[in-house]
Curated annotation (Swiss-Prot):
Quaternary structure note: Interacts with the Sec translocase complex via SecD. Specifically interacts with transmembrane segments of nascent integral membrane proteins during membrane integration.
Organism: Buchnera aphidicola subsp. Schizaphis graminum (strain Sg)
Chain's gene name: yidC
Annotated GO MF terms: membrane insertase activity
GO biological-process terms attached to the record: protein insertion into membrane; protein transport
Membrane topology: Multi-pass membrane protein
Name of the protein described by the UniProt record: Membrane protein insertase YidC
Localization: Cell membrane
Keywords: Cell membrane, Chaperone, Membrane, Protein transport, Transmembrane, Transmembrane helix, Transport
Entry's transmembrane regions: 7-27, 338-358, 419-439, 453-473, 494-514
Family membership: Belongs to the OXA1/ALB3/YidC family. Type 1 subfamily.
InterPro entries in the record: Membr_insert_YidC, Membr_insert_YidC_N, YidC/ALB3/OXA1/COX18, YidC/Oxa/ALB_C, YidC_ALB_C, YidC_periplasmic_sf
Amino acid sequence: MELQRNFFIFAFLFVSFLLWQAWQSQSLKKNKKNEETNSFFHLNHKKEDKNQIIIKNDVLRLVINMYGGDIEEASLLDYKTQLNSPENLKLLETKSDFVYQAQSGLIGKDGLDNSINKIRPLYSAKKNFFELGHNEKELRVPITFIAKNGITYIKNFILKPGKYNVEVEYDINNLSNKKLELNIFGQLKQTVKLPKNRDIYSGNFALQTFRGAAYSSSDAKYEKYKFDNIANHEHLHIITHHGWIAMLQQYFVVAWVPDTNISSSNIIYTSYLDNDGIAIIGYKSSLINIPSNSRYIIKSKLWIGPEKQQEMALVAPNLDLTVDYGFLWFLSQPLFKLLSTIHNFIGNWGFSIILITFMMKAITYPLTKAQYTSMSKMRELQPKINELKKNFGHDKQRMSKEIMALYKKEKINPLGGCLPVFIQMPIFLSLYYMLIGSVELRHAPFLFWIKDLSDQDPYYVLPIFMGLTMFFIQRTSSNNISDPFQQKIMHFMPFIFTVFFLWFPSGLVLYYIVSNLVTIIQQKYILSNFKKNQKR
């Protein structure tokens, strides 16, 4: 009876989780505040190879359009598009069917990026290729625009070795006889509909994570905002004194972090280009005054790279929260730290998962012992319970009262076997989110045919073996179920779970296999000891 209840509870929770995932992907977050879009959101770009420069360090390769100095392409040199692919992953890209750019500029009365006729300034550079040297600590790439009034605008891109954060610095030399009034902005724009070559998990519900916009403000450490909301013109207009804006996808993030020292406040906004199907999230600073005959420097940071929590936390507060661990982030984060610590010693993520499974089973062993002890006691009481059902079957209320009195007399908690299920489910889900949300596990091999623990088993060997272990567990305990129909349902449950697990990350299936094997050993040990104690 206990095992039957446990399986049904676990199945109910599991299916509820899958339905919740599907609902999340379809539901819309209602409008926070609708705002009229400003024209600078829609700044045009001219993609001409002769007006592009390339800058790179050892982890990033950036293509910059000299019209406005926007970053139109960003390749991550340590990450490939897919497993065994020679092509580096392009996080930012500008193509005919897909646009993903990081734009920045100066707007307002004296801004270069004219919001009236949408013309971008054409910067100049000394050459078209810049690369960080082997022993250099910093690569500073200046692009320059000299206005007719004698004002010099220098836009510096600063890269450091091994770093994914790009410092974007405006150096403005106001040699005119008037005060300048302008605002700095930074925005991300991306085509909402992915082309097939970028939508690699479209057919696998189990491996999909959040893709959309996000921000941090004075009132919210971290908020996700769906592309669907932006496409429906449910636009954000948030005044904040600090924070950042970002666009997220599985394992990777692009984020603008404004310098709060040069602006008393910033406006976080969203917009949507209906004709192009492009979503925009950005920030605009408050008014910046630059006196005549003075020099002024405005800085901002741009993160273009993997969701590495420790590094992102150093770039901006709360930026590390963009790692999508779902609603159980408070469990996934410590589990990942523990898993990383184990990996530092073992060097293999698969064996690290196995070891953390042993640790979880050891921690929950008292609950497992209580579960199977309760099951055994319930089985011993089954003849007495059947007798009560026979005697009081005509009076359901009296029968329930007598059965509860029997439980109390024998010191049995009828719900004692359910607690391990409720403990196991959050651990299972937090591991699931950790495996599909941690970039460290992307393309991480285990053994033999398992080349990527974050992806499904290509040959379905692990899910089938997991189903066999589950079948063995429930079969060895099915003596508690007397109803033949219920027995058939319980025998069918492993098959249902096997089908679900076909598309789950192989690392998660590995965890469940090891957990089941340990459960089988614990089950035999606990039941054997119980029988010995009963004979004494």
